[in-house]
Structures are given as structure tokens and as C-alpha cells.
Regions:
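Bacterial N-terminal signal peptides that target proteins for export
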Residues: 2-13
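Bacterial N-terminal signal peptides
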Residues: 11-22
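Low-complexity, acidic/polar, glycine-enriched regions of mature
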Residues: 23-206
Length: 206
């Protein structure tokens, strides 16, 4: 006895299969190349008697999205191009820049780059996320966590965040009361602040 197949059901069955696969099969990953001209990273370091501010360029970077959410990525910071923006006097500005590049701070002759590698991105609400990752400065790597706002569309990904970094975890101890006594008003606070704006443009599917 031959079983007759009702051909009218085939389109419905195929539609059901494709609908199921849409839930099972993840969307293709997409790479986003960091736009180093549109991206910015500024810093503020504070001491007992005041503070200083500046900027440091992002030299390269790549992010990976699943089509909706940022999943992984990394970027590199050019410490040799670090600048100070709050000292107008040319000599005073150059003196502070030189000191920050010295071994007392970032030691850029030996360690010209800093890097950040994303470990996880956890949604909170709307465009707000918690980002965890590994920050490497002066050859030392530590995991940091910070809140970020991430706006994602088909062609561009923009992330903004305020990040607090404890410099002593990266062997930058100059002027730290945590390690030196009797510093008085020459003490420099252990934590410095970063204000990040990361802009990346989609390349192609992986």
C-alpha cells in the first residue's frame, strides 16, 4: 500500500523548519574595526594639591558582535603619544609628559603600548552593560570591570565608559601613600580615571 503525500503541507513544513532554525542557529558574527580617529581616551590623575588631565590615542582595535550584542574584542593604546592638556606652559607641559613616560610611571621606552581585551559583556538594561576584561599596562595584566553604554547597529558600534584604574596594581607606585610614608602634600592618589569613547565600523562577516 502506497502512502500518498499531500504536497500542500510541504511549504508549511519548510516554513516551520526555517523558523525553528532561526532560533537554534546563532546569527553570523561580524567584525568591527575601531575607528582610531573617531575614538578618544582621556585621563585624569589626582594628587593632594590638585589634578592633571590629558589624552592618549587608541592605535588599533577590533570588536566582534553576534549581530545584536558585543561579544569580544580588544584595543591597543599608544602610551608614547600620551599628552597633557591642562598645562599651557610649553616647558611645564613637556616636563610632566616626560615624567609620565619615565619609569616612575608608564616606562614607555620598554612598554610603549597598553592593551585591553574583553572577557565578557553582560546586558543590564537598554544600552547599559557591564564589561569585564584584562588590562595590561607596563607588562602587568589585571582584570577590571566597569559600566558601559553600547549603541549597536548594522554598520557601527559605539561604546562609552568611565573607568577607574588603580595604578599600583600595574607597578606604578611613584608618590603613592600606599607604599611610601611622609609624602605630605606630594602624595598622588593611586586611582586615575579614564573616559573612553570607542567607535568601530563593521567590516564583514567572519
Amino acid at each position: 500500500m502506497k502512502t500518498k503525500i499531500n504536497l500542500n503541507y510541504i511549504p508549511l513544513a519548510m516554513a516551520a523548519i526555517f523558523a525553528l532554525l532561526a532560533f537554534i542557529v546563532p546569527p553570523p558574527a561580524a567584525k568591527f574595526k575601531v575607528d582610531t580617529k573617531a575614538s578618544t581616551l582621556t585621563w585624569v590623575g589626582k594628587k593632594i594639591t590638585g589634578q592633571h588631565a590629558g589624552a592618549v590615542p587608541i592605535s588599533t582595535g577590533e570588536l566582534v558582535s553576534d549581530g545584536k550584542l558585543l561579544k569580544e574584542g580588544s584595543f591597543e593604546i599608544d602610551l608614547n603619544a600620551l599628552t597633557v592638556t591642562d598645562i599651557a606652559d610649553k616647558d611645564g607641559n613637556a616636563k610632566l609628559v616626560g615624567h609620565l613616560k619615565s619609569d616612575d610611571f608608564f616606562g614607555t621606552t620598554k612598554f610603549p603600548k597598553a592593551t585591553f581585551v574583553i572577557s565578557s559583556v553582560t546586558p543590564k538594561s537598554g544600552n547599559d552593560y557591564t564589561v569585564k576584561g584584562k588590562l595590561t599596562i607596563k607588562g602587568k595584566t589585571n582584570e577590571i570591570e566597569f559600566p558601559a553604554t553600547i549603541v549597536h547597529d548594522a554598520k557601527k558600534l559605539t561604546a562609552t565608559a568611565k573607568i577607574v584604574v588603580d595604578r599600583t596594581k600595574f607597578d606604578i607606585r611613584y608618590g603613592s601613600k600606599s607604599f611610601f610614608d611622609n609624602l605630605g602634600d606630594k602624595a598622588i592618589y593611586d586611582e586615575f580615571e579614564l573616559d573612553l569613547k570607542l567607535v568601530a565600523n563593521q567590516q564583514s562577516g567572519i
